[in-house]
């Protein structure tokens, strides 16, 4: 069947839809209305909030969200890169914006409230505002130092009250910002403002949720991406909590790697001497304390075996396995605190793995005989340093052995007095 050309109406004028007709002029109309309203409200931020609330029904905030936020922050529409589009025409700009505000926490916090109210009223602006802040952080080079400081304070306060997610910080990892030192400098100001709103635990928790806790070193150029450099920079800036947090994160990462490598070596049944040398090198290289290492060793040793599910057989299996690795544990339990950590680890393991409940005392006695644990450590654990998990069961198991230790100690003391 042949396709016939559709007839065309001649002499008919098609009316342009009203929306399409004025779209061309809307950005400037939007800007002019916003600038005029902000200038009329002046420094009265309550009046600004009311103006923005009521004007949302007349202006298309959804379509021109970037213009809205550009003007509220910078006082003008911004071109790509961050330069002011209307820099030469003061009638198209306003001085009643974040960048023109006083550089103090309370003033910027009041501006943050304007954004909070606006986004609560027009929920659809939430994502647009997040995108705007990511964009503004990319434009930092175009802003003056004072403007950068105010933007950092605003960002920190909004992160603190939950208006913004920590993911906006990914913009700071841009090469140009990092190389020129802008990223680190901005981050310090931002974190100070954030911590003025929330405690350090809340801040670090947000960083973890956004998977940024492991990326903080990226605020610095590659040749300065060390924990020591980060710690000094942030501690000197009065943010020791962040320095400590990063050290802990790095230490946890190091421990995970060490545990993985140890697990591999134990599964390959490497000679104990080799394992000792490897662990000592890692301790020195990563500044790891013995108390951390002894816990890792215990975990790795216990993970190296498929344990029997029968309670009456597992104790014998455990003693045979632990006797083999007692010399390894002995090397890294040379301090009283390390011995207590090991005792608590054994206690927790036996409590968490029910088949081991009755094996606790036998394991402790084995370690005592193998010079892994001293009587001083065992007595201290018994009297005051035991964990809460299953303590009544384990203290009862240990009662006779502890009495024997105490009697032996008394006998040796009396023999010393006689001689």
From Swiss-Prot:
Domain W2 as annotated: residue spans: 248-415
Keywords carried by this UniProt record: Acetylation, Cytoplasm, Phosphoprotein, Translation regulation
Entry annotated with the keyword Manganese: no
Cellular location(s): Cytoplasm
List of residues that carry N6-acetyllysine: 117
Residues the record lists as Phosphoserine modifications: 412, 414, 419
Entries under CDD domains matching the protein: W2_eIF5C_like
Location (main, coarse): cytoplasm
Region: Disordered, residue numbers: 1-22
One GO location term (cellular component): membrane
GO biological process, one term: regulation of translational initiation
PROSITE patterns on file: W2
Pfam families for this protein: HEAT_5MP1_2, W2
Function: Translation initiation regulator which represses non-AUG initiated translation and repeat-associated non-AUG (RAN) initiated translation by acting as a competitive inhibitor of eukaryotic translation initiation factor 5 (EIF5) function. Increases the accuracy of translation initiation by impeding EIF5-dependent translation from non-AUG codons by competing with it for interaction with EIF2S2 within the 43S pre-initiation complex (PIC) in an EIF3C-binding dependent manner.
PANTHER family: BASIC LEUCINE ZIPPER AND W2 DOMAIN-CONTAINING PROTEIN, EIF5-MIMIC PROTEIN 1
The family this protein is said to belong to: Belongs to the BZW family.
Assembly mode: Interacts with EIF3E, EIF2S2 and EIF3C.
Name the record gives this protein: eIF5-mimic protein 1
Organism this protein belongs to: Mus musculus molossinus (Japanese house mouse)
Underlying gene: Bzw2
């Amino acid at each position: 069947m042949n396709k016939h050309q559709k007839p065309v109406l001649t002499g008919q004028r098609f009316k342009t839809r009203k929306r399409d007709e004025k779209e061309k002029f809307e950005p400037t109309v939007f800007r002019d209305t916003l600038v005029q309203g902000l200038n009329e409200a002046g420094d009265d931020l309550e009046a600004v909030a009311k103006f923005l609330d009521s004007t949302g029904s007349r202006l298309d905030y959804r379509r021109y969200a970037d213009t809205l936020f550009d003007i509220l922050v910078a006082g003008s529409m911004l071109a790509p890169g961050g330069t002011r589009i209307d820099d030469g025409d003061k009638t198209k700009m306003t001085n009643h914006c974040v960048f023109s505000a006083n550089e103090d926490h309370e003033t910027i916090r009041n501006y943050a409230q304007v954004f909070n109210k606006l986004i609560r009223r027009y929920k659809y602006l939430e994502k647009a505002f997040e995108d705007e802040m990511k964009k503004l952080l990319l434009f930092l080079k175009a802003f003056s130092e004072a403007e950068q400081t105010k933007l950092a304070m605003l960002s920190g306060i909004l992160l603190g009250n939950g208006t913004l997610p920590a993911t906006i910080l990914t913009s700071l990892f841009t090469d140009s910002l990092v190389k020129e030192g802008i990223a680190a400098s901005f981050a310090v100001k931002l974190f100070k403002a954030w911590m003025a709103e929330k405690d350090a635990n809340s801040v670090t928790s947000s960083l973890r949720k956004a998977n940024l806790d492991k990326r903080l070193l990226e605020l610095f150029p590659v040749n300065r991406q060390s924990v020591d450099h980060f710690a000094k920079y942030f501690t000197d800036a009065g943010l020791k909590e962040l320095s400590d947090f990063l050290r802990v994160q790095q230490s946890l990462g190091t421990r995970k790697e060490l545990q993985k490598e140890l697990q591999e070596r134990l599964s390959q049944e490497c000679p104990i001497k080799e394992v000792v040398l490897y662990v000592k090198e890692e301790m020195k290289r990563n500044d790891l304390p013995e108390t951390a290492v002894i816990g890792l060793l215990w975990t790795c040793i216990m993970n190296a075996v498929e344990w029997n599910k029968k309670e009456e057989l597992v104790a014998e299996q455990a003693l045979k396995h632990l006797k083999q690795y007692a010399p390894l544990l002995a090397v890294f339990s040379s301090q009283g605190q390390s011995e207590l950590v090991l005792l608590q680890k054994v206690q927790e393991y036996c409590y968490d793995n029910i088949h081991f409940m009755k094996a606790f005392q036998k394991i402790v006695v084995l370690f005592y005989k193998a010079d892994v644990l001293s009587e001083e450590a065992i007595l201290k654990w018994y009297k005051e340093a035991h964990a809460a998990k299953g303590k009544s069961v384990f203290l009862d198991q240990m009662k006779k052995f502890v009495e024997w230790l105490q009697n032996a100690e008394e006998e040796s003391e009396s023999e010393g007095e006689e001689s």
